[in-house]
Amino acid sequence: EIPLFSHYQIESQIESAFQREVRLPSGGSIVIDSTEALTAIDINSARATRGGDIEETAFNTNLEAADEIARQLRLRDLGGLIVIDFIDMTPVRHQRAVENRLREAVRQDRARIQISHISRFGLLEMSRQRLSPSLGESSHHVCPRCSGTGTVRDNESLSLSILRLIEEEALKENTKEVHAIVPVPIASYLLNEKRAAVSAIESRQGDVRVIIVPNDEMQTPHYSVLRV
C-alpha cells in the first residue's frame, strides 16, 4: 500500500519547507534567508528569463512567487518582519497586480499580516504575527562548525591568523614552547607553505619552540594555541 502522504505528494511539500531555495513552476525560484532582524526573500528568474518578453516573464515569475511565498510563510510559520525582493517591473500596474496577488494569497492565513507597497527599489515589506516558533527554530540547531555564519575561513587566512597568535604567545615571558593544535589541512599548510614563517618566529624569540600538532578530529575553523 502507498502511504497517504506519498500518494498526495505531501512528503515533497513538507521537505520543501526545509530547503533554502524553492523552485517555481516557470523555472524561477525563491530563496529564503532568516536573520536575527528579519526574513529576506529573493526572487530569482533563472531559467524563466529564456522567454522572449523579459518584462512579461518578470511579471509572471513574481505572480508565481507571491503565491509560493504565502504558502511558505504558513509552512515554515515565519513571523516578524519579512522583506521580499521582487524582480524589477517597470509598469506600475504590474507592481500593483503582484501586491494584490500576495494579499489575496495570504487571506487564508490565520496569522495577522500587514503588507506595504513595492518600493522603487523593488522591495516589499510585510509583517506576520508570530504564533509559535518557526519551523527552523524548532527543528534546526546552529552548525557547530561555522557557528551559524554559513561560511568558514579558507586555509590560508586561518593559517595566517594562527601564526599571528603563535607569535603573540611566544612574546610572553617565560614561554618555552608554543603548541598549535590544528586541523590536518592547516597543519599541512603551516608545515609546507609557511615553514619559513614558523622558523622566523622561533629565531626572533630565541629559546621558544613552536610545535604544530595535527588533529584529525578537528575541523576548520577550530584550533587551539597553548604556551608551555
Give residue ranges: language-model regions.
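DE-rich acidic low-complexity regions and acidic surface loops
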Residues: 1-228
